Amino acid sequence: HPFNAVYSVGDQVKVEWKGSWWDAIIIESNGENHLIHYSGFESSWDEWVTAERIQKPN
């Protein structure tokens, strides 16, 4: 997918983790990196990811 995709706080996205794509929401962003929360998981799983690991859901 294009690396110039723009993601915003509150966006519902898919995030790649160990070869699988998981539902997540962006809860913070600093431009290059995004803090995501995996839907249905505790906040201890929240992590900063680069745009390469994010895609918009179909």
Model-derived regions: residue spans:
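Eukaryotic chromatin- and chromosome-associated nuclear factors
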Residues: H1-N58
